[in-house]
């Protein structure tokens, strides 16, 4: 029997600004990554997401980013290693308080946007992210691409690393994601569903047609995608057709 974790980035609304359909996607995924107030999210949204994690029994992850509401955390900002570590600790502490109030725990950390991409290629950023998780709680896992600096450094430190693939993003031949400002960056509809199935089976096709080996533990559907709920529904259905079951990576598997 084969299993795959399906995760969604949620909690990215704040104030009167609404992003995504958080509760609607919860029955369709096994893990969530909650924005922690720096790139998106606020204290009311974070509290609600922790409540939903408890109600739906999904893995609760922190989704910290650069302090960049204006750019939605998708702009790389030069910070020192100490600053990056501390900004992550700040965000982890905030989400942890809401999680504790709901009787749940943070199971993983997935950096957001530019911080995620920087940690893949920049040693200093990867070290800062890994250190933040290590000093906060070394039992918490890190979610990242199945290669790159963060994967290597976190693994060397003995942290649990969850290898991630993306249903709705294009891939470069080297396994990195196509930058959002380039052609082929996004996958939609049936193309995204097909890519999710391929990832669950251990491979993905790059924008140039190259077939890449991709052993992943979890597949992401971006919650801010307007078709996220429909996409997650279709992915669930097609995975079942392949006898692949959606289940949180933390749970014991037969």
Curated annotation (Swiss-Prot):
Any Pfam family matching the protein: LamB_YcsF
The keyword ATP-binding belongs to this UniProt entry's keyword annotation: yes
EC number: 3.5.2.9
InterPro entries, alphabetized: Glyco_hydro/deAcase_b/a-brl (IPR011330), LamB/YcsF/PxpA-like (IPR005501)
GO biological process: carbohydrate metabolic process
Keywords of the record: ATP-binding, Hydrolase, Nucleotide-binding
Catalytic activity field: 5-oxo-L-proline + ATP + 2 H2O = L-glutamate + ADP + phosphate + H(+)
Keyword Lipoprotein: no
Alphabetized Gene3D superfamilies for the sequence: Glycoside hydrolase/deacetylase
GO MF assignments: 5-oxoprolinase (ATP-hydrolyzing) activity; ATP binding
First-tier enzyme category under EC: hydrolase
Task of the protein: Catalyzes the cleavage of 5-oxoproline to form L-glutamate coupled to the hydrolysis of ATP to ADP and inorganic phosphate.
HAMAP family, alphabetized: PxpA (MF_00691)
SUBUNIT field: Forms a complex composed of PxpA, PxpB and PxpC.
Family: Belongs to the LamB/PxpA family.
Protein name: 5-oxoprolinase subunit A
Organism taxonomic ancestry: Bacteria, Bacillati, Bacillota, Clostridia, Thermoanaerobacterales
């Amino acid at each position: 029997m084969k299993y795959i974790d399906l995760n969604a980035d949620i909690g990215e609304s704040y104030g009167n600004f609404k992003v995504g359909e958080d509760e609607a996607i919860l029955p369709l995924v096994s893990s969530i990554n909650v924005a922690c107030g720096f790139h998106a999210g606020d204290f009311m949204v974070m509290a609600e997401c922790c409540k939903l994690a408890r109600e739906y029994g999904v893995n609760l992850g922190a989704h910290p980013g650069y302090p960049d509401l204006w750019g939605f955390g998708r702009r790389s900002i030069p910070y020192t290693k100490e600053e990056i570590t501390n900004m992550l600790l700040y965000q982890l502490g905030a989400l942890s308080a809401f999680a504790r109030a709901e009787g749940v725990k943070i199971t993983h950390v997935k950096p957001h946007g530019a911080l995620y991409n920087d940690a893949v290629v920049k040693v200093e950023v990867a070290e800062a992210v890994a250190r933040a998780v290590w000093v906060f709680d070394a039992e918490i896992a890190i979610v990242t691409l199945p290669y790159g600096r963060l994967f290597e450094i976190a693994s060397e430190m003995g942290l649990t690393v969850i290898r991630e693939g993306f249903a709705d993003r294009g891939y470069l031949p080297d396994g990195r994601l196509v930058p959002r400002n380039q052609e082929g960056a996004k996958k939609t509809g049936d193309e995204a569903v097909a890519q999710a199935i391929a990832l669950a089976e251990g491979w993905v096709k790059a924008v140039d047609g190259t077939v890449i080996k991709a052993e992943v533990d979890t597949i992401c559907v971006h919650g801010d995608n307007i078709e996220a709920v429909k996409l997650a529904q279709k992915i669930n259905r097609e995975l079942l057709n392949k006898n692949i079951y959606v289940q949180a990576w933390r749970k014991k598997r037969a």
